[in-house]
């Protein structure tokens, strides 16, 4: 058995008509089905460690 709390993956999808919309970003290394965690300034994959930095928003 795994340690910790299990995730409810059904919360990461939205169904509109006949289409499925993924609400979270998927990892480009691991492929579809592995979602990336959204942090304040980055996206991170918990499986392989891949990380993408968010672009800072410009203030006008």
UniProtKB/Swiss-Prot annotation:
Pfam families: Ribosomal_S27. GO terms for biological process: translation. Its cofactor is Zn(2+). InterPro entries: Ribosomal_eS31 (IPR002906), Ribosomal_eS31_arc (IPR022845), Ribosomal_zn-bd (IPR011332). Binds 1 zinc ion per subunit. GO terms for cellular component: ribonucleoprotein complex; ribosome. Signal peptide: none annotated. Keywords: Metal-binding, Ribonucleoprotein, Ribosomal protein, Zinc, Zinc-finger. One of its GO terms (molecular function) is zinc ion binding. NCBIfam families: PRK00432.1. Belongs to the eukaryotic ribosomal protein eS31 family. HAMAP family: Ribosomal_eS31. Part of the 30S ribosomal subunit. This is Small ribosomal subunit protein eS31. It comes from Methanocaldococcus jannaschii (strain ATCC 43067 / DSM 2661 / JAL-1 / JCM 10045 / NBRC 100440) (Methanococcus jannaschii).
